[in-house]
Amino acid sequence: MEKNQKEIEKELEELRKREKELEEKIQKLETIAKNSNLRVAELQREIDYLKERYRRDLEEQRKFCYEKFAYDLLEVMDNFERALEYGRQAQDVKSILLGIEMIYSEMKKIFEKYGIREIPVEGKEFDPYVAEAVEKVETDQYPPNTVVKVIRKGYYIHDKVLRPARVAVAVPPQEEEGEEIT
């Protein structure tokens, strides 16, 4: 019986030792879990901060994305004001027209600088992706569905349609009532 009790005490000692080891492992794992949770919370705060910073930066870019373009247009505005002032005093219409042509040329250069260009449509087949047909012109001088007149120019900004052109499109002439077809 003594042997049994010694064996039991030995087993009990081993179990206590094992229990202590397991408690230490649990303690370590709890510490790791706590540190991991702290790190996750820290990373979440960092992500939230970066999201907010990105949102602010994007808003700032939206607000000022046309700043350079607007600055370049100020020179055109100044020239228009000078032309208007000169026009009020000038007697010579040709010099006023020349000033307006210079301003128009300057404006086209600024548009070109920013990737804004006219959509060439006149004389071409009507394309609803770049133009709106606002008039029909009966004619046999052009094939049907050909743009015969640009009413308002259309523009691209890079490869995207900024504003579609408004155009008149050729349609075949209608036969007059009472005319016989022979």
UniProtKB/Swiss-Prot annotation:
Keyword Ribosomal protein: no
Keywords in alphabetical order: Chaperone, Cytoplasm, Stress response
UniProt xrefs under InterPro entries: GrpE (IPR000740), GrpE_coiled_coil (IPR013805), GrpE_head (IPR009012)
GO CC terms: cytoplasm
Keyword tRNA-binding: no
Bridged cysteine pairs (disulfide): none
Location in the cell: Cytoplasm
Gene Ontology terms, MF aspect: adenyl-nucleotide exchange factor activity; protein homodimerization activity; protein-folding chaperone binding; unfolded protein binding
Entry's Gene Ontology BP terms: protein folding
Primary localisation category: cytoplasm
Function: Participates actively in the response to hyperosmotic and heat shock by preventing the aggregation of stress-denatured proteins, in association with DnaK and GrpE. It is the nucleotide exchange factor for DnaK and may function as a thermosensor. Unfolded proteins bind initially to DnaJ; upon interaction with the DnaJ-bound protein, DnaK hydrolyzes its bound ATP, resulting in the formation of a stable complex. GrpE releases ADP from DnaK; ATP binding to DnaK triggers the release of the substrate protein, thus completing the reaction cycle.
Description of how the protein assembles with itself and partners: Homodimer.
Family in the record: Belongs to the GrpE family.
The name this protein goes by in its record: Protein GrpE
